[in-house]
Amino acid sequence: MSAKRTKDAGRDDKLIASFQVDHTRIGYGIFVSRRDRVGGAFVTTFDVRMKRPNAEPAIHPNAMHTIEHVVATYLRNSRFRDHVVYWGPMGCLTGFYFLTSTEREIGPREIEPLIRAAFRHLANYRGPVPGATPVNCGNYLLHDLPTAKFEAKAFLAKKWSFDYPPARRAKAGARTVFDA
């Protein structure tokens, strides 16, 4: 991706890679957002996209919070638990980031069975939301299990993609402009 820049209050910052993805063309699925080497490990940030950005309603914050709790608990108790770094919501409320640490590079198709299993677990979940107490959670009343289960079922029913659509580039004089 290009080193597109933004200017704000005298700063000249490079636009981060995830903002250079064409969000008007992202579908449902699991995408590699970035890969980093940390020590001897490959830390991969996966974009688990449940909604089409700017094309359908975002997930309600209460449901996002519940999805975060139930899926994070599932992942951290799965056979993959030693490789889970983080599971958390995107600010745009269209999906989640899943960070893994592995000895070799892994891709979306390798974690697809785990993500599908986590969402099936959520879709069928009964009982209290894990960690939804005043002691364990900073906003324990901000939960909605029925809507979280609905969103899990809807996501599982979608056809998933595994490659980001490339950002469209256009030349404007000496500049390259991205539509994302």
Where do the language-model regions lie?
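Intrinsically disordered, low-complexity segments enriched in small/polar residues
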Residues: R25-G27, Y86, N136, K171
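M16/MPP (pitrilysin/insulinase) zinc-metallopeptidase core fold and M16-derived inactive scaffolds
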Residues: P53-R109
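Active-site-adjacent, His/Asp/Glu-enriched structural segments that form or flank metal-binding
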Residues: G88-S161
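Long, charge-rich alpha-helical interaction segments
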Residues: F150-F178
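A domain-level signal for the structural core that forms small-molecule/cofactor-binding pockets
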Residues: Y74, T133-P134, R175-F178
